[in-house]
Design a protein with these regions (language model features):
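Upstream accessory/linker segments immediately N-terminal to the RecA-like ATPase cores of bacterial MutS
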Residues: 1-103, 494
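Conserved helix-turn-beta segment of the N-terminal RecA-like "Helicase ATP-binding" lobe
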Residues: 158-195, 329-330
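C-terminal helicase module of SF1/SF2 nucleic-acid helicases/translocases
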Residues: 75, 292-310, 314, 318-571, ...
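Conserved SF1/SF2 helicase motif Ia
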Residues: 120, 134-163, 171-175
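Loop/turn-to-beta-strand initiation segments
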Residues: 147-149, 176, 199-203, 219-222, ...
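N-terminal pre-P-loop "Q-motif" helix
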Residues: 95-119, 133
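Post-DEXD/H (motif II) to motif III coupling segment of the RecA-like Helicase ATP-binding lobe
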Residues: 217-222, 228-306
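Conserved motor-coupling elements within RecA-like helicase/translocase cores
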Residues: 183-204, 212-220, 344-362
Length: 651
């Protein structure tokens, strides 16, 4: 019994792909949920041309990245001193236990700072995973070396938030901190400018106001940029000038996919925080029709435990009316505030401060809370018209709650009686199901990762990424980077295996079609016995002891993997004979094959057929001999012989 995936092309063309080769098939993901995808005709030239254009763009991108990296390596930088006693004391004052990811990221950043070339590191981590603490430790290292540090943020609200966090974190240490934003009066701004120029100010936190011509530093040593992609083109150009010879740390809550990280390894330094802080609980998420009774109960339940609430109404024109309705519903004794991006500076600053101080119990707001707001006491979130927001945005907004050990609740609502589009329904299902940290959560992160890849590579490359799909583009970029470095991209010899053996995932073992497809793909992508054992352990943990067809399926995957290493592109059984076809005459490991054919046990049943362009090794099976086990043994012996011959040639 074998399973196949049926792929339909325009017209009546159909392709059946064996489940054992599902590693060759990936779902098209281009980052645009609603954008229709134009299908290529089977055997046509459209796809070849599109892929060629994307490959050329990836090559240009690789050249540009390598040139930028080489230029930065030539610039003189400041080598910061190793950690001092004060640095250790500052880090010991952290009120939480660091995760391994945080500690590793901190060590990588310090190593960069102590080097004599300017640091250019990207720190990626989900909302609430502790990037700010990592950045503040880098700031402390900079200040203790007698230099100034700047933290650049996209919004005024976030500048105030970081300022408050820094004041608390550096309390008791001789660090002079200032904030530069539109909340400042003329006199206050002049004082900050003067302190920066004279060196009195050690750390300044601000919006793009920091990029203005009148901002002069006495001795800037570290620039921390939070959510760089939110800045405009002009600001980014000014940022490049400012960061040329100072250590730069960029923070991103949009995850950069591991595959892209690997493709750019050695070109763009990246640190990732993938694990949530200790004691952090996933947010309990509900998707439901908007119902004032349910909402009132949810708010009262949060207020009863001393917490606060975000109520997101994303229309500025009607936000005051919404707040009035909540007052009527909850009673005048409940303190309700309003926050949106069109408010004047003082008004918005005052509201956010009142919320932080606990004076406002329910904040009716727009998506202004999406970036950086960190108030651990707000642990219930209600979103109106959640079906209008993208998965990435919903995830970011939900990340504003659940920032303490207390359980948090999110209510994603849509209008009563509204029939959701298929896309919106899928999005809301994903945000509900993937609240957990872990494997399911990573599936929901797919949309975020595509956005992260687009942010890192720029809008032009995002277009090419959409034309061929996310996975294919990353493969092309990785190959282009290796080529630009003068390294050879690994040649992929694909191998099909068609043996008379029952190898499949029975429905009785994994009932969900979607999960079966995912496991099929993961099994087909196995390359080593260690990977196979890890996946087997996971299967046992999730579904119980696997039946024989599942184990045979994993053996077929390992057979394909070993066969690829020795240049075999097809394994096929016809009755009592198995043929191993090589990908051309050059692919045949002649010495290894001849050594195997000359063994007494193989003399009558193993022959090399060199006719045609694709040489074949033919193996005759004895009665009752297991085809899969025999094929595994033969391919394993060939690989060992080939490796030994290569060692002898090297010596």
């Amino acid at each position: 019994v074998k399973d196949y995936v049926k792929i339909a092309y325009p017209g009546t063309d159909t392709l059946y792909v064996p489940a054992t080769q599902l590693d060759l098939v990936s779902k098209y993901t281009g980052g645009g949920e609603e954008k229709p995808v134009k299908l290529s005709k089977m055997g046509g030239s459209d796809w070849v041309k599109t892929r060629s254009r994307a490959k050329s763009a990836a090559k240009d991108m690789a050249k540009k990245l390598i040139a930028l990296y080489a230029e930065r390596q030539r610039l003189p930088g400041h080598a910061f001193a190793p950690d001092s006693e004060w640095q250790r004391e500052f880090e010991d004052n952290f009120g939480y236990t660091e995760t391994d990811d945080q500690l590793r990221s901190i060590a990588e950043i310090k190593r960069d700072m102590e080097a004599s070339v300017p640091m250019d590191r990207l720190l990626c981590g989900d909302v609430g995973f502790g990037k700010t603490e990592v950045a503040l430790r880098a700031v402390m290292k900079c200040v203790l070396s007698g230099k100034q540090a700047a933290i650049l943020v996209p919004t005024t609200v976030l500048a105030q938030q970081h300022y408050q966090t820094a004041l608390q974190r550096f309390f008791g240490f001789p660090v002079n901190i200032a904030v530069m934003s539109r909340f400042k009066t003329g006199n206050q701004a002049s004082k900050v400018l003067s302190d920066l120029a004279t060196g009195k100010c050690d750390l300044v936190i601000g919006t793009h106001r920091l990029l203005s011509k009148d901002v002069k530093f006495k001795d800037l040593g570290l620039l921390v940029v939070d959510e760089e992609q939110r800045f405009g083109v002009t600001h980014k150009e000014k940022l490049k000038e400012l960061s040329r010879q100072v250590d730069t740390l960029t923070l991103s809550a949009t995850p950069i996919p591991r595959t892209l990280n690997m493709a750019l390894s050695g070109i763009r330094d990246m640190s990732t925080i993938e694990v949530p802080p200790v004691d952090r609980q996933p947010v309990q998420t509900y998707v439901l029709e908007h119902n004032w009774g349910v909402i009132a109960d949810a708010i009262r339940r949060e207020l009863a435990r001393g917490g606060q609430v975000y109520y997101m109404h994303n229309r500025v024109e009607t936000i005051d009316r919404c707040a009035a309705q909540l007052r009527k519903l909850l009673g005048e004794e409940i303190s309700i505030g309003v926050a949106h991006g069109k408010m004047d500076e003082k008004g918005l600053s005052s509201v956010m401060q009142q919320l932080s101080d606990g004076e406002i119990q329910v904040l009716v707001c727009t998506t202004i809370i999406e970036t950086g707001i960190d108030i651990p006491n707000v642990n219930t979130l209600i979103i109106e018209d959640a079906d209008r927001l993208g998965l990435a945005q919903l995830h970011q907004i939900r990340g504003r709650i659940g920032r303490s050990a207390r359980r948090a609740y999110a209510y994603m609502t849509y209008r009563a009686g509204k029939i959701l589009t298929e896309v919106a329904a899928k999005r809301l299902t994903a945000i509900r199901e993937y609240a957990e940290f872990g494997s399911g959560f990573r599936i929901a992160m797919r949309d975020l990762e595509i956005r992260g890849a687009g942010n890192l590579l720029g809008p032009e490359q995002s277009g090419y990424m959409m034309s061929v799909g996310y996975d294919m583009y990353l493969q092309l970029l990785e190959e282009a980077v290796l080529e630009q470095r003068g390294e050879k991209a690994p040649q992929r010899t694909e191998c099909s295996a068609d043996l008379t053996v029952s190898a499949n995932l029975p429905e009785s073992y994994i009932s969900s079609g979607e999960q079966r497809m995912d496991i099929y793909r993961r099994i087909a992508a196995l390359r080593t016995a260690e990977q196979s054992q890890e996946l087997l352990d996971e299967l046992i943990d999730r579904y119980g002891e696997p039946p024989p067809p599942v184990l045979r399926l994993m053996d077929v995957a390992l057979l394909r993997a070993e066969a690829m290493q020795i240049g075999v592109c097809d394994i096929a059984q016809r009755g009592s004979e198995i043929s191993f076809t090589f990908a051309g005459a050059d692919a045949v490991p002649v010495n290894a094959v001849m050594a195997l054919c000359s063994l007494p046990k193989n003399r009558r049943r193993l022959t090399l057929s060199a006719t045609g362009t694709e040489p074949k090794l033919l193996l005759r099976l004895t009665p009752n001999e297991d085809a899969l086990d025999t094929a595994l043994t033969l391919v394993g012996d060939l690989r060992v012989n080939k490796e030994e011959n290569e060692k002898e040639v090297t010596l």
